[in-house]
Amino acid sequence: YTYRLPLFRMLKDAGVNFDFVGSRQQGLKGDFEWPRIDGEPFDTDHEGVYGIRTAKALARLPEAMKKWDETPDIAIIHLGTNDLKSPETFHEDVIVPQRDIVGLLRRGNPEVVVLLSHLHWPSGPAGNLRERVEALAAGLDSDLSPVRTVSYQDGFETKPGTDLLDGAHPGPSGSEKMARAYFEAMQPWLPEE
């Protein structure tokens, strides 16, 4: 499952002209056949990597960006889940790499809008990380290249078999809730019909 599929549908339903960007096209199961949305093939381009830590995502991004057909106008960054076991090093492991990822995106497009996603859990280590991500967004935000945080935790069930399949990865309902939050967050920057 991926939030990108319902986000694709929401953008199509809203009449938005868009193109997902990324060097990757496969999900966790490489042979999975994505459904068509209203007769159109799902745009599978993305830069998500299952199980990746934030610093590793930063390290692979410069090479990945060379494969992109376009530079993004809006970027969703959902990182940090795989760093939660080391809360004492959140700054070095999550915040600094996310800051540097925003810098790389801005080199590609100085006007990129960045949406920094909070993680699924509202408390515990993810809750502690939340404050740091808010501070990062506030420090990076500019008129030319806005940086906003996105939260979808209200009403999001984190027990296995609910919005999260296994307590960590979103299933269909969790993906839908994430997509809705991202779709609403990007509204001010979506192109007019």
Where are these regions (language model features)?
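Short, well-ordered alpha-helices that flank and scaffold nucleotide-derived cofactor binding pockets
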Residues: 5, 9-13, 107, 135, ...
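N-terminal cationic-hydrophobic initiation segments that often serve targeting/anchoring roles
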Residues: 12, 65, 102-107, 137-141
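Loop/turn elements at helix/coil->beta-strand transitions in domains of secreted/extracellular proteins
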Residues: 14-19, 70-76, 109-115, 142-148, ...
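Residue-level recognition of beta-strand->loop/alpha-helix junctions
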Residues: 22-24, 118, 151
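Surface-exposed acidic, glycine-flexible loop patches that form ligand/cofactor-binding
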Residues: 57-72, 103-109, 187-192
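Active-site segments of SGNH/GDSL-like serine hydrolases
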Residues: 76-85, 101-130, 153
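Catalytic His-Asp segment of secreted/periplasmic serine-dependent ester chemistry enzymes
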Residues: 120-193
